[in-house]
């Protein structure tokens, strides 16, 4: 049987009697299971070396409850290769699109209690049209999936039963799949647009999946996703050319949870909540090295009553957690999280109804103390005041220091050890404990930390939420002096799965400066973003160097010549940087080691207007950083200049 025939047979649109005797032998009736309410099982016994199912058209919607599609039944699947639940064993069965065809969705689920397990899926996308299609994705969940394209004879909206919660598929489970990447763990030639779209589903479970290299988000919700559980997935390197956020929640999301995931190296936020109805819990996740293409907060919250707790959040070109001012966002509890290496506050509450572009991406910086009751209405989390220390230098005696200050009366103060250098704010590194502010707003805490340590605090008011952090205070010796403690050792960008081999032991010796004869730029044709053969050779050399030296990271700066508008050139420079990044991805360079920065026409090589000067302007520059803090010597090249 083909997969299409198996789905039709399960749905009842293909009858058993119409099958050939050979095909009938592949179908067995599970009477006890049917009596217990369980539906059909679809297993796989594909010939060795022929385990890729390439579609030329949409598969039938899954309409029968209780169906299980189990790719782990295919010979060759080894569950022992799963060393971490977030990195499932490599599936053997691949579901993709045949070359030269466009298929919008891999699987469309319109029934309850459906399980999809053990597949590799990629290639599901649609070309841009005058009227855009409904979301193309690996897996689409809805009571009745809308048509891919808009047509004059489409049924009315009521047919989709969006206003009937009981019609939504319930308890759909997506587990142990590789979504977006190939079986060889590489970027596909044709990436999928999205990973999983929960358009209209209740109590959906997405767990133990590896989700990488989608043009858009790995998980996105639509009209209804109440009770959604996203648990222990590896969500890496998504948003390459579209919606940049790893997880984007919209619509009805009450009682949803995002727990235990590795959310790493995505192009935007790790989690972005856009005008949701209901609240979610985000806890116990590693959210790091995101914002590869956009300067966004690691977690961006709209709405009220969300809880963000016990997460590790860091290495973000923006704030750690941002709470919007509009729509009204209150009572969001943001506690026991650990932050590192942020280009912004650990927690940023958008103030005074600010709705600029930056306010919906990364935050607006520290807020002044609340000066009016109106701030309760127009600022995130009711404008809970950040704590203020009585002084910003506290003397430590015998290894302890009494830290005092003020906050909103009755709030709970979470104190943090700030491990990084810099004033007046720093990432909240190590949680130290909690104290209570009295009715006058006074608080005190005894801390056991060495002289030179830096501390900060957050205030949480259950009626309004958690505040922004306090400015940093330093623990000093009795005479007011303090040493400058060394910052934490740099962390190499790493989103890779665990290795079964022990880590190599290196001889400890002072690193020597690198002297590399490595080109740091490539050039493009007029109004083009394709990689030329000459530029490809240069990129091959860059990729080989980055694979050899894992402590190198790179920013890809896109540039254009000055012709055309600033907006057009900004988009063109981004396309050029993306083309270079995608080429390096296909050569095996990890996405967490690269970041896109488009400059448009703002940084020309010279002010000349000759053909040669314009050719030099049309470039991507590679700005390398040695995470050991050493200088690197690079060279420019012009071997791939393209004169118009």
Where would I find each of the regions flagged by the language model?
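Beta-strand signatures of extracellular beta-sandwich domains
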Residues: 68-70, 412-416, 458, 555-557
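All-beta strand scaffolds that present successive hydrophobic residues in beta-strands
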Residues: 69, 115-116, 173-175, 204-207, ...
């Amino acid at each position: 049987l083909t997969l299409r025939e198996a789905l039709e047979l399960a749905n009842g649109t293909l009858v058993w009697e119409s099958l050939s005797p050979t095909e009938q032998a592949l179908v067995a009736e599970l009477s006890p299971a049917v009596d217990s309410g369980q539906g059909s099982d679809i297993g796989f016994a594909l010939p060795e070396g022929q385990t890729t199912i390439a579609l030329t058209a949409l598969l039938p919607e899954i309409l029968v409850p209780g169906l299980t599609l189990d790719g782990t039944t295919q010979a060759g699947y080894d569950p022992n290769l799963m060393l971490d639940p977030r990195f499932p064993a490599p599936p053997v069965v691949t579901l993709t699109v045949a070359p030269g065809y466009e298929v919008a969705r891999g699987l469309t689920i319109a029934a309850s209690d459906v399980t999809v397990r053990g597949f590799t899926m990629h290639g599901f996308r649609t070309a841009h049209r005058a009227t855009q299609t409904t979301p193309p994705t690996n897996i689409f969940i809805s009571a009745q999936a809308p048509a891919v394209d808009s047509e004059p004879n489409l049924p009315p909206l009521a047919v989709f039963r969006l206003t009937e919660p009981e019609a939504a598929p319930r308890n759909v489970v997506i587990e142990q799949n590789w979504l977006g990447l190939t079986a060889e763990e590489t970027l596909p030639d044709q990436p999928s647009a999205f990973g999983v779209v929960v358009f209209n589903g209740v109590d959906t479970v997405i767990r133990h999946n590896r989700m990488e290299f989608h043009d858009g988000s790995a998980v996105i919700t639509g009209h209804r996703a109440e009770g959604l559980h996203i648990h222990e997935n590896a969500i890496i390197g998504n948003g390459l050319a579209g919606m940049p956020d790893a997880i984007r929640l919209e619509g009805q999301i009450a009682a949803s949870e995002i727990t235990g995931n590795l959310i790493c190296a995505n192009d935007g936020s790790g989690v972005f909540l856009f005008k949701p109805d209901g609240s979610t819990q985000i806890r116990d996740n590693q959210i790091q090295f995101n914002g590869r293409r956009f300067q966004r907060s690691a977690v961006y919250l709209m709405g009220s009553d969300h809880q963000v707790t016990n997460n590790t959040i860091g290495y973000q070109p923006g704030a750690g957690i941002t709470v919007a001012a509009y729509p009204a966002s209150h009572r969001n509890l943001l506690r026991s999280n650990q932050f590192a290496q942020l280009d912004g506050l650990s927690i940023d509450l958008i103030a005074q109804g600010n709705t600029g572009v930056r306010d919906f991406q990364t935050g607006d910086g520290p807020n002044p103390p609340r000066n009016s009751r109106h701030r309760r209405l127009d600022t995130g989390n009711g404008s809970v005041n950040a704590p203020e220390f009585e002084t910003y230098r506290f003397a430590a005696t015998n290894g302890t220091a009494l830290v005092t200050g003020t906050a909103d009366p009755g709030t709970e103060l979470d104190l943090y050890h700030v491990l990084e250098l810099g004033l007046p704010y720093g990432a909240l590194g190590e949680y130290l404990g909690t104290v209570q502010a009295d009715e006058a707003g006074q608080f005190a805490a005894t801390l056991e930390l060495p002289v030179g340590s830096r501390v900060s605090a957050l205030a949480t008011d259950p009626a309004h939420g958690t505040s922004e952090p306090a400015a940093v205070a330093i623990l000093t010796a009795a005479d007011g002096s303090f040493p400058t403690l060394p910052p934490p050792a740099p962390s190499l960008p790493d989103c890779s799965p665990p290795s079964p081999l022990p880590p190599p032991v290196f001889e400890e010796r002072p690193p020597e400066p690198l002297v590399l004869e490595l080109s740091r730029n490539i050039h493009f044709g007029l109004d083009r973003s394709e990689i030329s053969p000459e530029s490809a050779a240069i990129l091959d050399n860059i990729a080989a160097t980055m694979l050899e030296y894992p402590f190198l990271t790179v920013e890809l700066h896109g540039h254009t010549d000055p012709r055309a508008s600033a907006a057009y050139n900004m988009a063109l420079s981004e396309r050029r940087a993306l083309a270079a990044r995608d080429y390096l991805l296909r050569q095996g360079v990890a996405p967490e080691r690269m970041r896109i920065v488009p400059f448009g026409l703002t940084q020309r090589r010279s002010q000349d207007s000759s053909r040669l000067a314009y050719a030099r302007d049309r470039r991507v520059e590679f700005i390398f950083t040695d995470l050991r803090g050493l200088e690197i010597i690079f060279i420019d090249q012009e071997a791939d200049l393209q004169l118009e």
